[in-house]
């Protein structure tokens, strides 16, 4: 016959699970995308973060350069065509009315600029927080962006 054991104090102890600590350590994106998703500073080394930021910055700068050239060409070409049409007598420009409209637009812009929207302030604060938290990636992005513009 087997001997009956008295439960020891170790057998009766239970582990208390703190769910707030668990939620802090296991973000929602870990459940959605897996364990390897999350902020870059938690996942990758500094060198990898710089490379990721630099490559993405270079791509953005290169595209910005190409699109910027295309936009500048389109705007410049439009002004050139307007000047040719004006010189040829096809169109008449009322410069006094243009000046009046430009001055009205300046006044409206100054009024609106003095009233900064709370959405803009929130966006600026969020952007600043992101850059502070991911300073290595942000630095790599800026460097890559400048290289992309130069190439």
UniProtKB/Swiss-Prot annotation:
GO CC entries? mitochondrial outer membrane
Q: Tell me, what does this protein do in biology?
A: Acts as an activator of hypoxia-induced mitophagy, an important mechanism for mitochondrial quality control.
Q: From what organism does this protein derive?
A: Xenopus laevis
* Motif, YXXL: chain positions: 14-17
**Alphabetical UniProt keywords:** Autophagy, Membrane, Mitochondrion, Mitochondrion outer membrane, Transmembrane, Transmembrane helix
Location in the cell: Mitochondrion outer membrane
InterPro entries named in the record: FUN14
Q: Please give the family membership noted in the entry.
A: Belongs to the FUN14 family.
Tell me yes or no: is Cell division among this UniProt entry's keywords.
Answer: no
Q: What is this protein identified as?
A: FUN14 domain-containing protein 1A
Question: What parts of the sequence cross the membrane?
Answer: 44-64, 71-91, 130-150
Q: Which GO terms describe its biological process?
A: autophagy of mitochondrion; response to hypoxia
* Annotated membrane topology: Multi-pass membrane protein
The answer to whether keyword Transmembrane helix applies is: yes
Xref: Pfam families: FUN14
